[in-house]
Amino acid sequence: MDRSEIVARENPVITQRVTNLLRTNAPLLFMPIDIHEVRYGAYMLFMYGSLENGYKAEVRIENIPVFFDVQIESDNTNQLFLKSLLTAENITYERLESITQRPVMGYREKEKEFAPYIRIFFKSLYERRKAITYLNNMGYNTAADDTTCYYRMVSRELKLPLTSWIQLQNYSYEPRGLVHRFSVTPDDLVSYQDDGLTDHSIVMAYDIETYSPVKGTVPDPNQANDVVFMICMHIFWIHSTEPLASTCITMVPCKKSSEWTTIVCSSEKNLLLSFAEQFSRWVPDICTGFNDSRYDWPFIVEKSMQHGILEEIFNKMSLFWNQKLDTILKCYYVKEKRVKISAEKSIISSFLHTPGCLPMDVRNMCMQIYPKAEKTSLKAFLENCGLDSKVDLPYHLMWKYYETRDSEKMADVAYYCIIDAQRCQDLLVRHNVIPDRREVGILSYTSLYDCIYYAGGHKVCNMLIAYAIHDEYGRIACSTIARGKREHGKYPGAFVIDPIKGLEQDKPTTGLDFASLYPSLIMAYNFSPEKFVASRDEANNLMAKGESLHYVSFHFNNRLVEGWFVRHNNVPDKMGLYPKVLIDLLNKRTILKQELKKLGEKKECIHESHPGFKELQFRHAMVDAKQKALKIFMNTFYGEAGNNLSPFFLLPLAGGVTSSGQYNLKLVYNFVINKGYGIKYGDTDSLYITCPDSLYTEVTEAYLNSQKTIKHYEQLCHEKVLLSMKAMSTLCAEVNEYLRQDNGTSYLRMAYEEVLFPVCFTGKKKYYGIAHVNTPNFNTKELFIRGIDIIKQGQTKLTKTIGMRIMEESMKLRRPEDHRPPLIEIVKTVLKDAVVNMKQWNFEDFIQTDAWRPDKDNKAVQIFMSRMHARREQLKKHGAAASQFAEPEPGERFSYVIVEKQVQFDIQGHRTDTSRKGDKMEYVSEAKAKNLPIDILFYINNYVLGLCARFINENEEFQPPDNVSNKDEYAQRRAKSYLQKFVQSIHPKDKSVIKQGIVHRQCYKYVHQEIKKKIGIFADLYKEFFNNTTNPIESFIQSTQFMIQYSDEEQKVNHSVKKMVEQHATASNRAGNPAGNPAGNPAGNALMRAIFTQLITEEKKIVQALYSKGDEIHDLLTYIINNINYKIATFQTKQMLTFELSSTHVELLLKLNKTWLILTGIHVAKKHLQALLDSYNNEPPSKTFIQQAIKEECSSIKPSCYDFIS
């Protein structure tokens, strides 16, 4: 069935009504989804979406004025002058028009409020852009000068949101296939608000399955033998998870299902063409998949290119027909679109943007919703939402079914693929993704594409311009081009009161916070660029005329920045653009939150089976989406105001907001202190306050006069919390009145949400406690935690568990009469249990995550990825599977564990493995498959101890001298060192490792002495060899033979070393084999290997010296050995050639050949020796072994060598 047939089947009543309206050319409702512009020639705007019943529609808007504005700042600049400038540059324009507007930058008094501008009209965007560039380069200020997407300006000027219902009037109508085409002018479009309307836009969710003959690899579209063999597709109403139609396109026949239509294709080319054909029958408004912008779309496009059908496929799918291949690749195949996930993270997307259908990657949407998610797979996101999971079908089985062509099994593959596509829509609906982004688009006058693919600041900027240009906000002329010098520096820091660290168990602490501090400051002090006064003379002049000004000053890049903002004094007409917009957003959100609360209460009273439940649920989701959109804009407002790349950026405003925040927090601080309250901590927009002791006198005395049981103490704590709540409510009202008197408005307010008791502060922005919100609640399992490392992304379960145990134990109510263990005692008790009783930990407790960012200098991750790359290359050489070592996508998080490596020491006895985390990292799947031992001690030392030190670093013994600047860092370092010594004292493995190092150093000292003796003998012999000019060859032979005999004399050294190692092994066995260590004595083997390697290295240096000392000897050896090689070669081919040699030469040749054999044998022996050592053989090679090795090697390299010599 095609789209029109499906719509008629599903919505017969609405379809009949829409059909009647089309016949009579009556007004129609249209929901835009996708926007495209014709930028060359006469400008036209195309909007694609659906009519009220779900019909696909194209709305072409013609006769849109194309213009921008130029500010006239000189009497010499007029229309004639501008015309001459444009004509001189061959810029074609239509006409010029004089207008007046308010400039956005700088305060202007009432009589000079408006400035003259000239509006220049054009026929095309090309000429307009040329003119903007030219006049900006000439120094003119321009406005309404969008140079990227003109449709945003159209939306702002017409007050026509691009993501909500629009009523089409006076249209020209032309049905064409499945698409209903309309032509209108801007006057024929009217914004239509009706939240009760149901949107019947269509979403297509799809998934592809691919195959590679190279097992264990991810199929690559650039490989000819890697194919896409199946594509499964559903279509849905945009708000529903029930499929309207489903199709499975496959290259392999599979058992048919009643739940979907199966199309069997004979080749990959036909499969791709069938996909495009089905797409064209459904003409969806939105196309979505999971990770399709990173895999599915690039695979489809690349394979279509290889088959030479991309142009055909695009023109089937697109509503812009007859596009050529180069145009498709240049304009519609988006290869690298950077999508903002969070402030720190972006992701690259690739997709084919066919006009009429908006591409949307569900994975990107979910990552934006869960920016700190450890796992970003489809299965993980489904689990987070409590939705049904995907089907479990391993790739190796899927590929096996594909190879065997088993239709029964291929039906399982089809079901797997169909369900994956279904789950994409499930996630979109569960998270209300499209309605949320639509509401953002409505507020910001941007398209749905903008709301998906652009960051929040871009939309805030567009929203500000939309407010500014209309009469009710003063017709402010705004540019979209950032101007002026862009300075980078820090604005005034927040006012911070260092925390009083430690555990507070005697009286409650309450957090007092400014509500939306920065937006509140903007509203209170009228921070807005058109209210800014730059000069002191102008400020004095305005104050003399009775204006009230707010002065700001701060240091920025070693200079004083100052300025004044004209205050509004609560007079609406005096409010600046920023405060007006924020107040409007705030009022709208307040109304929506009230409505949301009522709808929520109704939802709780109605069962899901009630006929009206779905409608109520839909209404609740829509209202929630609206208030969320408002919240997003309010929260990102200051970010755009402080962004030095924004056209609205004003340094005195950005710094003035933060410095005013400082001022007000100090103001409240002094007020609270003077009231007799105490301050535990303060930072940026909040203070943590304790009430005066006198508040609790009566309840404390009642407790002291009681039997002092634990029940009485709990009652005391309960009453203290209630008294604190009451006192803070009163204090909060007093603070707000004090602020109102100071700044003259009620926009700047403080509120308290919870009382913390007990509470512990461990550092700046680091604290935890039991939160009491409406009533006292002493549940230690529901702690209020801020900044403690257990909530940090990537942490292991081990760290979280130990941290939670410490915090829960410290939060227990204990009477003063009982033993109240200090925090350091609690930490040591929990830590000891964690270290000594290691059997309590499971493999999952050690899994942690990290992000792969190739451009970031994360040494451990870089080392790990380098190792994984080497493994992949090694496996590929042998034709083995390597997918288990695949590199994650840049920016993607991956899971790993730290495994135990054999403790290694260098030749001097120093450990070499402590600083190489990257060498110990292993993927979780690999560590599980090979049952690799976890390096628990690494986790304890590198993760757990830092967390534990944070709890105790306030102890007196860890405090720094007065001359230390960073006292917290010093105390933290000392506390961690203290805990490291504590762990060494209780961990058996750590003791064993220390002993190993001592034995290594003893052995090294002994062996080093012996080596020096032997090297001395070698040196004398080779010295004689080089000085013996009469018979150098004989001396060389004797010296080299001595090297072979040296191996016999090594036994003395080895015997002594072996004895030390055996003693160490005995001592280690008595200490017990530590958990996670393999049995035996690998440390001893490593020691032997290290010593042997040292001996070999020293010998090799001497042998290599033969080739570098003495040109004569070198040349002689080379000449004769070459002749030997030549003779052997000729002998092997039985083609002996005449070669005249004197008897002296023959004798010399034979002696040198013997020498060469011995020399070769030494290298061979070393090779065999190294192989032997690598297998942990404790016994050194004997003389017999070396001689046998020489014979074997020589006979293998030169089979006829001995025959020739004889």
From Swiss-Prot:
It catalyses: DNA(n) + a 2'-deoxyribonucleoside 5'-triphosphate = DNA(n+1) + diphosphate. Sequence repeats lie at residues 1071-1074, 1075-1078, 1079-1082, 1083-1086. One of its GO terms (molecular function) is DNA binding. Keywords: DNA replication, DNA-binding, DNA-directed DNA polymerase, Nucleotidyltransferase, Repeat, Transferase, Viral DNA replication. SUPFAM superfamilies: DNA/RNA polymerases, Ribonuclease H-like. One of its GO terms (biological process) is DNA replication. Induction: Expressed in the early phase of the viral replicative cycle. Residues 1071-1086 are annotated as: 4 X 4 AA tandem repeats of A-G-[NK]-[PA]. Its EC number is 2.7.7.7. Consistent with its intracellular location, ASFV encodes its own replicative DNA polymerase and three base excision repair enzymes: a class II AP endonuclease, the repair polymerase Pol X, and an ATP-dependent DNA ligase. DNA-directed DNA polymerase involved in viral DNA replication. Belongs to the DNA polymerase type-B family. This is DNA polymerase beta.
